[in-house]
Amino acid sequence: MPFMTRKLTLVLTAGLTAAAWQPPILAHTPAANLFDAHVALGLPQAFALPRETDDERGPGVDEVVIKERLDTDAAYPDGSHATTYAGTAGSHEAVFTRLGPTLSVSVLGQSVEAGATIARHRSAPAPGQDDVIVPSFAQPARIHAALTDHPPAELRFWIFLHDDAGESNYAKFHNWYVAWWIRDMEKTVKPGIPVKVIIKDHLPGVTDFDYRQGRRDESLFAFRSAADGYLYEQGVMPSALTKVMLFVGDRPDNWKGAYGIAIPRDTVAMASGTGPRHGVAHEFGHTLNAQHEYAETRFPCVTNMSAYVPGLFSCQIYSGQNDVQIREYVQQTVEREAH
């Protein structure tokens, strides 16, 4: 009998220990619960939505209309997936994101950069014109046809959060950089194939990459190699339709004053968290053949490929011509890789 008692005690102890390792179940916020209840009834839905306590616009209540759920998948390092909806908040177009226990709202056409409640100040100038890297003969741009005989059915964007970026709040990162960009890509740019965004962090050899050393073109090529190595390990064949970005904290001296760098019509880019809200969209835009010359100033904001215009905020869209540039690039790349 003592043996049986001890055995039972060990089993119970092991069970309690295993239970202690289960991830905590986080309570959803009141706004998130209200949002979920209305969306569950089917779309569209119109209702009054109180803002989250950390809403970038401050406290308040919005009359919202949730029109549709977007198809684009955004996967985060903890295994969570952002669910993104398009609609309106008041008189403005808006994007609503459910990620984890919270609800985030990104309102287009409103300047919130100066007062945004993000981990650090996000109202820095937009990327300068010196962020485009022209490959040399010694380090050629990637040849699309040589990548893989089986191109993905998706336009994939891998964002690697550098260890020094300080981006541990995935919901805020998604709301600030990704949610509205997903909406624009899916609803306006319309590349013709599905879009997927994958965010990763804490990957030795990738997210601890030393981007401060050497020339910036050397840094880009070296990171592209490191990221491609990781993709191979995960069973993902690099492709001209698979883009990679290193998202860093402070911009290094070797960027020569830019808030990001990219190789046009290639697969690699870098962006700094000290830059503007459209920094990620800007640098990825270069890899999709979007160009500075087609950027527009739409007072009081600038489109994604614009250089710095003092006093203006991010429109959170590409210009009409850059929509065409991206659409044609993707279509031509799909056709090229299919042969």
Language-model-derived ranges and their functions:
Residues 66, 85-87, 94-96, 103-105, ...:
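Hydrophobic beta-strand residues in large extracellular and virion-surface proteins
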Residues 87-160:
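Non-catalytic propeptide/linker segments at domain boundaries
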Residues 1-5:
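N-terminal secretory signal peptides that target proteins for export/translocation
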Residues 10-11, 23-107:
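N-terminal prosegments of processed precursors
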Residues 6-21:
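Gram-negative bacterial Sec-dependent N-terminal signal peptides
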Residues 263-339:
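The catalytic-center signature of Zn2+-dependent metalloproteases
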Residues 97-104, 115-121, 172-175, 253-271:
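Surface-exposed flexible segments
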Residues 133-260:
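Fold-level signature of zinc-dependent metallopeptidase catalytic domains
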